[in-house]
Each structure stands twice: as C-alpha cells, then as structure tokens.
Amino acid sequence: MGPRIGPAGEVPQVPDKETKATMGTENTPGGKASPDPQDVRPSVFHNIKLFVLCHSLLQLAQLMISGYLKSSISTVEKRFGLSSQTSGLLASFNEVGNTALIVFVSYFGSRVHRPRMIGYGAILVALAGLLMTLPHFISEPYRYDNTSPEDMPQDFKASLCLPTTSAPASAPSNGNCSSYTETQHLSVVGIMFVAQTLLGVGGVPIQPFGISYIDDFAHNSNSPLYLGILFAVTMMGPGLAFGLGSLMLRLYVDINQMPEGGISLTIKDPRWVGAWWLGFLIAAGAVALAAIPYFFFPKEMPKEKRELQFRRKVLAVTDSPARKGKDSPSKQSPGESTKKQDGLVQIAPNLTVIQFIKVFPRVLLQTLRHPIFLLVVLSQVCLSSMAAGMATFLPKFLERQFSITASYANLLIGCLSFPSVIVGIVVGGVLVKRLHLGPVGCGALCLLGMLLCLFFSLPLFFIGCSSHQIAGITHQTSAHPGLELSPSCMEACSCPLDGFNPVCDPSTRVEYITPCHAGCSSWVVQDALDNSQVFYTNCSCVVEGNPVLAGSCDSTCSHLVVPFLLLVSLGSALACLTHTPSFMLILRGVKKEDKTLAVGIQFMFLRILAWMPSPVIHGSAIDTTCVHWALSCGRRAVCRYYNNDLLRNRFIGLQFFFKTGSVICFALVLAVLRQQDKEARTKESRSSPAVEQQLLVSGPGKKPEDSRV
C-alpha cells in the first residue's frame, strides 16, 4: 500500500525520496516508512496555497468560456434562427457529457493523478471552445434583410411599398428553401451541440477533483476560507464572460469579411448581430494557458504545518481507544466492497469498474438516506435551477423588457450582478470561519440568506415595461381602424411576408414590421454629426402620412433597468451566502474517503435536476410569451416580439418558485440538525452519571469496559 491520508486523528505520511521522483505514476513501495516532512525538500508546487490560486484561475477561465454562450444567447438565436427552448437546450448540453461521467470520475479520482486529470480536462475544454466557433466560418455571411448587405441603397429599397413588377428580387422565402440550406442549418446547430457536450466532458474532473484535493491537504480551519476564495474567484469567470460579450457584441458578426461599402445597421437596430464567435477564441486561449501548471503538481502533498501541529496537540486528549479502533482501516475485511460510517456508505478503494457499477445503486440509495445530505443537495438543486435560468436568459430578458442592446445588457450584468455574487460567496466563507459555525450555525445562515433573498424578489414583479404597440400584432385595431397587419392601404404593395425591418411612428409610438407594412414608398437619409438617420416617407398606412423612423420605438421606461438589476444583484448576494456553508455541511458530514464520491453525487444531482432542465424550462416559458415568430423554411425560428408583461411574470415567477423551494429545504435542514443536536446532548447527559459510577467501582487506575464516550 502506498502512502495515503489516513482517517481523522492520524498524521499523514510524506512520500520518501524514491517515491517523490516517480510521484503521480507509482505508489510508494509497500512497507517502506516515510521520512519526516522536514527531511524532504518540496518544490514550489508542493504548496496547497499555490494550488488554490491555480485552480481559482482555471475555474475562472472555464466558467468564462461556458458563460460566454449565455452572454450571447440572444445573438446566437438571431444568427441561426433558434427559439428560446432550443437555445436553452443548447446551453444545457454542457451538462450532458458532464453528468454521464461525473460520478465515475469522482470515485476513481482517488486512484489517479488528480492534478494531471484536471489539466487534461482543461485542454479538452479549450478544444471544445475552438469547435464552438466553427459554425461561423462554414456559414454564409449574415443576411439581415432580403437583399445582400453589400448594396445599402438596395437594402432600403427592398422594404418599400412598391408595385409587384418593380419589387426587388427577394432572398429565398419560406416556400423556396433548398435542401442544402436546411441541411447546412442543421449541421451548424449540430456542431454547436457537440461542442457544448465536449465542453461538459472536459469540465468533469476540474471542480470535484479540485475541491477534494484542497480539502484533503488544507488545514481544517482554513478549508472553508480556501473554498470561499475558490468559489469567489471562480464566479469572476461568468462576470468576465459577460464583459467580454459586451465588447464582442459591439462588433459586427462578419467583421472578418465586411463588404467594401459597409453595412446599414447600427448596434441599436433589432436586426444587429454581434461577433459572438470571437469571444470563444479568447476564452479558449485563456483555458489552455491555465491548464499548464497542473502537469507539475504532485499526486499528494503534505498537510499544512498548522494542521500537523494542531493534531499533535489534540491527539492525546481527543483520540480514545474506541475512536482509534473505529477509524482503523484494518477493521475492513478484504472481501468487503462497502462499509457504513456515520450514516454514509464508503466504497472500497479496490473495486473494478464493473464492481463499482454493481455496487453504486446501493451506495447511492444509502447515501441519500442521510437526511442532511439529501436536504442540502435538494436546496442546492433549487438554487442551481434559479441560477441556471437567470444566467442563461437574464441578458435576453433585459433586452426585451427594457429595450436595450445586448452589449449594454451584458455590461450591466457583468458590472452589477456577478460582483454581488462574489461578495456573497466571500462573506459566507468568512462568516463560517470567523464565527466558527458548526452544522447548526451553517444551517441557520443558509436559511436566513434565502429568506432575505425571497423578500427582495417580490418587487421584481412590478418593475418593467409593457410592450409597445405593434401594428397588426399588439395594436388594438378596433381603437384605430386600418392598422391591422394587411390593411387595404397596402394592397398595392408587394410586402414580403417574412420581412423584418421595423420602423416607428414617433407621433403615435406605433411600430410597423417593415416600411412596406406602413405603406411607405420612399426614403431619405438625414446626416448628423455623429450618425445618419433614415426616414421613410409617403406612408399611406400612417396617420396623416407622417414619416416613420427606421428602427424600433424607444422604450419610455428603460431607466428602470438599473433599479431592477440592483434588486436582482442584492438577491443574488444573499442567496450566495449559502454557498460555502452548504458545501461545508456536505463535506463535514462524510468521511475523508467519501468526500470525492459525495461531491460527485452532489454535482450529478445538480446537473441532472438543475443545470440540464432549468434552461429548457425557462426557455419554454419565454417562448409561450411570444406574439410574433419569424419563419425560416416553413419552420418557426426566432421570436421577434414578446408580451412583456407576461414575459416578466413568468420569468420572475419561475425564479420565485425555485427560491421558495430552497427556503423550505434549508428550514428542514435546520430542524433536523437541531433535533440531532438535542438528541446528542440528551444522550451525553444520560451517559455521564453511568460512566462516573463505573469509574468509582473500577478504581482510579482502571478504565471502564466498553466505554465509547
């Protein structure tokens, strides 16, 4: 048997010089005693603090590349004609490969070189990020109207009300789609699904191996702080992803193949598509660089010196013969595949893959019988469902609800929401360490944080903008006759059914899908100092024939986006107070040998019950609020207009539902912990008089038989 970290109460051994030379590939030769730690001169990589730093940077880069898709989800929808349900499914495919392997990799992590496995996974994540950009390079240039973007005057003319004989030729319509066009669409979408799956597979070893590695070799009192720092730095990844998305989406999607005459779109145009693919290249490079140090960390490293000194001081007064006998690994017979300790089941470390598959269902069921483990995981499932839906669709929600650009929405989220998440995680970790919170204290902190989060979520139902009037869609034709989608005023026009070039009547604040649907037959460009403004004139369907302005109507309540996001950020910070204490409830509730497996089971449930279904659930709910769909080759593509009031109620309502579930679970956790604490004190008070009486009978120099206090 090679050197291993023993149960609580044993001093960990340090590999000898021969083993150190081959560390990570071979175990220590059986029977050889390890030298004292000061006899070994460890390299700079034999430092758990350095590992915490490197792992924080890697998880930051990993979440940056996975979070970048969420920052550009609405842009990808417009570029490839996807519904919110499909884009939510695309985002959740990150978890498919991860879920299929997480438990097995977590268990067999005790046999492999964990840092190197983390490095290999990071390399796969970087390659998946590069694959994610491939659809951009194999697709045709983006067409934002029925004409080529290389001819701006033709672009303006294509949307005018013109007789059928003089109308410009349109691009392939819904009834004129070739099989090649549909096949190409399916191919590029399929590539993105494969890339997302590989992204999840590569991330399998990163978090569970890193958490268990830190908790194995860090001082017990430092572990909460280290994990708090790890999670806090990690959460900067999505924040950087949204900041990167804000920059990239200000660039036109085909920046690498811009036409000579430029384009007629501006960033405020609803047809604008930013360079979503460019951020994946940058994030993939960051992950590849962060993976390099992991190939130099050892398989095992000595515990921190404070841990060794602490154990030497307390071993003599806390380790009873009964405890040593209970924790001794020699108590397990060679044929046993599992053993029960402290309510959880530990799998023997010498199982084969087939044996592991056979014994895992029983281990899983017995693990879930532990009430604290089950309730904490269920509460984290609710929190993760809320976080997955919010992270995936909050940028799109802000765009639609407050009529702001995708770039500005990402900037606000990156500057407000994610810093608050970091603050919440750090404060939670510091409170656990400074207050020396035990299980009951951790449970109380989790419940308090979620109750406050739920309270500050109530005003979100009432902060938002109603949908502006759209002729023929949301406009009441009974109040204003002649403004339906195909009125008699535009019968002579040859308006494309699938056209989309919105214009706004400033006097009535009514929006039309195209200038043709407003009956406009001409256009003018007014040059200004900073930009040019396009007006469409001679509009037969507009009241008094007023000119209409190119672009959607501006929202009258866009200023509410900042108060809305401040409340969201405050709720996120309060919810993240529970992050570190809930993890400590799981890590401190299992044996050291069970930690990797317990974390693996935890993440398996989070992915199966939260990160996989939640984006699809939120996307489906968003799709039900759509009032006008774009069509592509006869199929429903991207949504162009939503019912904003219904969108707000359903999106925030889902968030409120998951927060309520988390509050209920944490309340049950606290109740169970208090009951267990009460029973333990009662048992201790009852057993103390019996022990004292037995000591008097046995004499001062004898110990009571079968004492397990």
UniProtKB/Swiss-Prot annotation:
Residue ranges, annotated region (Required for E1S and taurocholate transport): 51-69
Q: Mutating residue 113 to Q leads to what result? A: Decreased low-affinity transport of E1S; no change in high-affinity transport of E1S
Record membrane topology: Multi-pass membrane protein
**Record-level GO cellular component terms:** apical plasma membrane; basal plasma membrane; basolateral plasma membrane; plasma membrane
State what changing residue 55 to A does.
Decreased E1S transport, decreased cell surface expression; no change in Km value and decreased Vmax value for E1S transport activity. Decreased taurocholate transport
Q: Known consequence of changing residue 272 to A? A: Decreased E1S transport; decreased cell surface expression. Strong decrease in cell surface expression
Q: Where in the cell is it found?
A: Cell membrane; Basal cell membrane; Basolateral cell membrane; Apical cell membrane
- Has keyword Transport? yes
Mutating residue 272 to F leads to what result?
No change in E1S transport; decreased cell surface expression
Its transmembrane ranges are 50-69, 89-109, 116-140, 186-215, 235-255, 274-298, 367-388, 409-432, 437-460, 565-587, 597-622, 656-673
Chief location of this protein within or outside the cell: membrane
- On the tree of life, the source organism's domain of life is Eukaryota
Please describe, based on the UniProt annotation, the reported consequence of changing residue 436 to Q: Decreased low-affinity transport of E1S; no change in high affinity transport of E1S
What tissues express this gene product? Strongly expressed in the liver, at the sinusoidal membrane of the hepatocytes. Expressed in the kidney. Expressed in placental trophoblasts and syncytiotrophoblast. Expressed in the small intestine. Expressed in the blood-brain barrier, in endothelial cells of brain capillaries. Expressed in the retina, in the inner nuclear layer and the inner plexiform layer. Expressed in skelettal muscles. In testis, primarily localized to the basal membrane of Sertoli cells and weakly expressed within the tubules. Also expressed in pancreas, lung, heart, colon, ovary and spleen.
Effect ascribed to mutating residue 276 to A: Decreased E1S transport; decreased cell surface expression. Strong decrease in cell surface expression
State the protein's name. Solute carrier organic anion transporter family member 2B1
